[in-house]
Amino acid sequence: MLRFAPSPTGDMHIGNLRAAIFNYIVAKQQNKPFLIRIEDTDKERNIEGKDREILEILKLMGISWDKLVYQSHNIDYHREMAEKLLKENKAFYCYASAEFLEREKEKAKNEKRPFRYLDEWATLEKDKNHAPVVRLKAPNHAVSFNDAIKKEVKFEPDELDSFVLLRQDKSPTYNFACACDDLLYEISLIIRGEDHVSNTPKQILIQQALGSNDPIVYAHLPIILDETSGKKMSKRDEASSVKWLLNQGFLPEAIANYLITIGNKVPKEVFSLDEAIEWFSLENLSSSPAHFNLKYLKHLNHEHLKLLDDDKLLELTLIKDKNLLGLLRLFIEECGTLLELKEKISLFLEPKDIVKTYENEDFKERCLTLFNALKSMDFQAYKDFESFKKEAMRLSQLKGKDFFKPLRILLTGNSHGVELPLIFPYIQSHHQEVLRLKA
């Protein structure tokens, strides 16, 4: 079984979605069940509704799952596993207070050395601290694993100490709950971000202590860097939020296409998730950081907009009139996002705001003169744009840019865009909606 294990503590990050997509693809390729595990044991950081938001995003991306579990439902199992380790003398109670440990951390910092917990501290405050934590005994050997992307990764004994499994309130730590659940659900491969590399030896040690002889294969994905700063994209970067990208009018198909493409060797530029299942391979992923490029994502989104079928295009743009499909297709050629497309069609159909767009009083006057001339014309009477244009120029007594710029604004709501002869048939059939001024 493969799994995706998000925490409901904020907006879904593009790095997390990338991991979800890759786990889903490999599960399909290997014909294995796919598990979604909501890691909600950190009650203080959980945000109400974020779990549902995550699941909704996965559905939008075309990702389905065979099983959905909430990690908090397994807390009795986690405690049972901790008790097993205590009985087998593989774990121990630690009575050292948070204040004591903080002092030791500060001392290590001042001495410019890494902080490592010492087992001798476990009983120092036993008389005054009656709520101990449970720690796994530190290993006396190195822990190594062969990462599917990073190759061999090794942690020496002095890099690992006796770490906490259960907190004072008997709630499991992230690493303990994660390791226990991966055993419980027989997870065979974990694809996740490289920020989890330091967690991996701890989870391996927990699973070995619990008697696992069937090691999990790990693949740690390189981080995604911001295109401008070159730094890791954090939650503060709005483009790192999948929700933000969707709200900006990027299609789920395009986002998935992009996240599969970056840092990868792909056989074609534009593809669907189902197509990627046919050829995706972890071996083709680079071990170097991927660079986020919003401009390229916009290009891919433009290509996916063109691939939308008629019904989906009408649904996404909220247009009920099928006669406008051709116009939508013309507008798509100039749009990178669904938001831009919706804005163009809205400007076309809504009353025109010449007060907002006029450059000076003379320009406003020309707009009003041309508007009155157009109102007197029967749009359906002209066989083409050329004959319509000549009559409009005659009636308004305007020519050149004094004619064309006001004309474009009055007919499309925009000062530039698709050539007017191409959209004139749609202007003819919708002229009563098109030729209106905002009060």
Curated annotation (Swiss-Prot):
Record's keyword terms, sorted: Aminoacyl-tRNA synthetase, ATP-binding, Cytoplasm, Ligase, Nucleotide-binding, Protein biosynthesis
Highest taxon above the source species: Bacteria
Motif 'HIGH' region: where in chain: 6-16
Function: Aminoacylates tRNA(Gln) with glutamate. Does not aminoacylate tRNA(Glu).
Disulfide bonds listed in the record: none
Subunit composition and interactions: Monomer.
KW Phosphoprotein (keyword) present: no
GO MF annotation terms: ATP binding; glutamate-tRNA ligase activity; tRNA binding
Motif 'KMSKS' region in this chain: 232-236
EC number assigned by the record: 6.1.1.-
One Pfam family it belongs to: Anticodon_2
Single GO cellular component term: cytosol
Protein name: GlutamylGlutaminyl-tRNA synthetase
Subcellular location: Cytoplasm
Gene symbol of the encoding locus: gltX2
Residues annotated for ATP binding in this entry: K235
GO biological process entries: glutamyl-tRNA aminoacylation
Family listed: Belongs to the class-I aminoacyl-tRNA synthetase family. Glutamate--tRNA ligase type 1 subfamily.
Signal peptide extent: none
Protein species of origin: Helicobacter pylori (strain J99 / ATCC 700824) (Campylobacter pylori J99)
Enzyme type, top EC level: ligase
Catalytic activity annotation: tRNA(Glu) + L-glutamate + ATP = L-glutamyl-tRNA(Gln) + AMP + diphosphate
